[in-house]
């Protein structure tokens, strides 16, 4: 079977859930200059064709720097914000205008290669961002550098209803006709909040947030962000992470940080369970809970491959329905990715840990340990003193977690009488 068939099957729930949802996407000026820009545009057009409502916010920092250099002007910054005097503002307007036209042209060109070939794609914009001056901070006059005052929510909403891609530039206008240079990250964050967007997607050079060892941090809650910000200091990665967290605290369901250097990063992040970058969300990504009758189908999908390999004892749907209350499960975005069951043994103070299984894609996240801990807690709550496990393949895993070799003779009579000598499972026990 071709790989794309399986991919499409797994992506179909996401395609459905993303339809008619508002996504605000921020692409910095460095991303527009990168060789992967064409692929990013293609992915955005594809996302639009699948029914997402897109607001694209672009940056322009390197383009402004280039124009300043061409005029022999030195850039000035204070607290990582550009000081925009009158000559600098001319460079900003020139850079932003040229960049906006280039992006619109690329979006129009990419339509021919998209699933919506032959349809009309509209890129819309205008004076949709009202701004105010930052003013004087610590004695430094920022001149024409501003901050977002208001997003024209109704105006953008009408454009999205007309199936336009809304393109916002890092410029804002005041009621008195002034123009202000804005940070694209701030524009994107405020747009996502004011539009009550489903997602804020932030492009950066890195794959996402990297921890101190350089490993990708795939998921974060907003309350976990401050510790990372302290470690990251004044880096651009910290700026992206802070914007992502602020958006979530203000009601945006999910913020994503992905790389503009990696082909297909956006699609991998939005249409796979593992994602491609860093996800920041208020909601719980995974839930460890007790199983209910509605979970039987998901349990069967999880354990069937292990049953076919002979690792787990086969259980029919009827058996699972009858014994569902014995199971604890780990659920991730509607998918059961791990399970374990506790069977108290009659006429004894012992129980059996059974059917411990973890989806192969999630076997290195400590979920087996979490389930074992939950089963032990449940066993203690029932007053059980000993926990038995019978296994044919995973003896070392249990021994590393405190289980000791035992024997069939040590099993309580009610369980020993059911022992399958043909399967010849090893018996281990652990005192609780």
Swiss-Prot record:
Pathway membership, UniProt: Amino-acid biosynthesis; L-arginine biosynthesis; N(2)-acetyl-L-ornithine from L-glutamate: step 1/4
UniProt-listed SUPFAM superfamilies: Acyl-CoA N-acyltransferases (Nat), Carbamate kinase-like
CDD domains given in the database record: AAK_NAGS-ABP (cd04237), NAT_SF (cd04301)
Cell compartment(s), UniProt: Cytoplasm
Limits of the N-acetyltransferase domain: 286-425
Family per record: Belongs to the acetyltransferase family. ArgA subfamily.
HAMAP family: N_acetyl_glu_synth
Protein name: Amino-acid acetyltransferase
């Amino acid at each position: 079977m071709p790989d794309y068939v399986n991919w499409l099957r797994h992506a179909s729930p996401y395609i459905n859930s993303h339809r008619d949802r508002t996504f605000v996407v921020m692409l910095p000026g460095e991303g527009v200059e990168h060789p992967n820009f064409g692929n990013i545009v293609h992915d955005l057009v594809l996302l639009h064709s699948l029914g997402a409502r897109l607001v694209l916010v672009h940056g322009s920092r390197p383009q402004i720097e280039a124009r300043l250099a061409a005029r022999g002007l030195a850039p000035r910054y204070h607290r990582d914000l550009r000081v925009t005097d009158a000559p600098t503002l001319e460079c900003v307007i020139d850079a932003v205008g040229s960049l906006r036209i280039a992006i619109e042209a690329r979006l129009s060109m990419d339509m021919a290669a998209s699933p919506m070939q032959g349809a009309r794609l509209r890129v819309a914009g205008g004076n949709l961002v009202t701004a105010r001056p930052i003013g004087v901070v610590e004695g430094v006059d920022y001149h024409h550098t501003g901050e977002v005052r208001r997003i024209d929510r109704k105006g953008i909403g009408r454009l999205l209803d007309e199936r336009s891609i809304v393109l916002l530039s890092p410029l804002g206008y005041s009621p008195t006709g002034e123009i202000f240079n804005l940070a694209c990250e701030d524009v994107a964050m405020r747009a996502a909040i004011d539009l009550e967007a489903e997602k804020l997607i932030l492009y950066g050079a890195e794959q996402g947030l990297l921890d101190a060892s350089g490993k990708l941090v795939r998921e974060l809650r907003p309350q976990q962000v401050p510790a990372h910000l302290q470690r990251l200091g004044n880096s651009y990665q910290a700026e992206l992470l802070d914007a992502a967290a602020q958006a979530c605290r203000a009601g945006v369901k999910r913020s994503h940080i992905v790389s503009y250097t990696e082909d297909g990063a956006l699609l991998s992040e939005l249409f796979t369970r593992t994602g491609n970058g860093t996800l920041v969300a208020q909601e719980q990504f995974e839930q460890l809970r007790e199983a209910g009758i509605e979970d039987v189908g998901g349990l069967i999908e999880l354990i069937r491959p292990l049953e076919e390999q002979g690792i787990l004892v086969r259980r029919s749907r009827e058996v699972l329905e009858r014994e569902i209350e014995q199971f604890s499960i780990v659920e991730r975005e509607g998918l059961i990715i791990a399970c374990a069951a506790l069977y108290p043994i009659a006429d004894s103070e012992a129980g059996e840990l059974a059917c411990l299984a973890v989806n192969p894609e999630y076997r290195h996240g400590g979920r087996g340990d979490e389930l074992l801990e939950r089963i032990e807690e449940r066993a203690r709550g029932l007053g059980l003193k000993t926990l038995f496990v019978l296994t044919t393949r995973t003896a070392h895993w249990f021994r590393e977690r405190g289980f000791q070799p035992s024997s069939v003779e040590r099993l309580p009579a009610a369980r020993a009488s059911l022992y399958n000598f043909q399967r010849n499972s090893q018996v281990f026990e652990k005192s609780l």
